[in-house]
A protein has these predicted regions:
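C-terminal alpha-helical "lid/dimerization" subdomain adjacent to the S-adenosyl-L-methionine
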Residues: 108-163
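A short SAM/SAH-binding and catalytic strip from SAM-dependent methyltransferases
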Residues: 74-87
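Core SAM-dependent methyltransferase catalytic element
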Residues: 152-183, 188-197
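A short glycine-rich, Lys/Arg-flanked "PGG" loop and its adjoining helix->strand segment in the class I
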Residues: 89-101
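A short acidic, Gly/Pro-enriched loop at the edge of an enzyme's catalytic core
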Residues: 64-76
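Short N-terminal helix/helix-N-cap motif within the alpha/beta-hydrolase-1
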Residues: 34, 86-90
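Short glycine-centered segments of the SAM/dcSAM-binding site in methyltransferase folds
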Residues: 2, 102-104
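Class I SAM-dependent methyltransferase SAM/SAH-binding core
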Residues: 4-6, 10-61
């Protein structure tokens, strides 16, 4: 299987997934060259650098298929990166273009925290803004609209009172994202990433 992470950052997800899935090949790109240096070092330290390739690229327009000379990817992942892209809808559509015919796009990102107390939500949004992160209002609805315009299937779930959202997009009917318990840790996101590998 070929797996692409868009906005791979320091390579945490790539290394974790590569160690758990020795049969798969992993690719990633990020706009930050400094983070990619860290990603390369992490992959080498974990002994999975032969199965992880990363390059610099802009999520809104980077053609990963051309860069890596591949026909497409079975899995494409955004992990808390789509909310950092200025034109996130363009980045989403670009990600769909990277999928192979049997491919699936997975998104894990910040939600609108609609069930949080007002003061807690305001503090969290202020803290996220320090890192140039802006949860996208109506992300799930917009993803569903854009995906359906291309005849794609969508399944989505919320975590921890809307703290995060898990979304899967596929050319084939996708299984429902299992409803996780309402808790604050990130184990469900990690399991979601692990489960995406075919």
């Amino acid at each position: 299987a070929r797996v692409l992470e868009i906005g791979c950052g320091t390579g945490r997800n790539l290394v974790m997934a590569a160690r758990a899935n020795p049969q798969a090949l992993f690719y990633g790109f990020d706009i930050s060259s400094q983070m990619l240096m860290t990603a390369s070092a992490k992959a080498a330290k974990a002994g999975v650098d032969e199965r992880i390739i990363t390059v610099a690229g802009d999520a809104e327009k980077f053609d990963a298929r051309r860069a890596f000379q591949l026909s497409g990817f079975q899995r494409v992942l955004f992990s808390y990166s789509l909310s950092m892209v200025p034109d996130w809808q363009r980045a989403f559509l670009n990600a769909l273009d990277q999928l192979s015919p049997d491919g699936r796009l997975h998104i894990v990102d910040f939600g609108e925290m609609e069930r949080w107390p007002g003061f807690a939500r305001a503090l969290m949004l202020k803290w996220l803004a320090r890192f140039h992160v802006q949860p996208r209002a109506g992300m799930t609805a917009t993803v569903e609209t854009l995906a359906k315009q291309r005849g794609l299937s969508v399944s989505a779930r919320k975590l921890a009172g809307g703290y995060a959202v898990l979304i899967m997009v596929s050319k084939e009917p996708v299984p429902a994202v299992q409803k996780p318990p309402e808790k604050a840790d990130n184990s469900d996101e990690i399991n979601f990433i692990h489960a995406m590998i075919p």
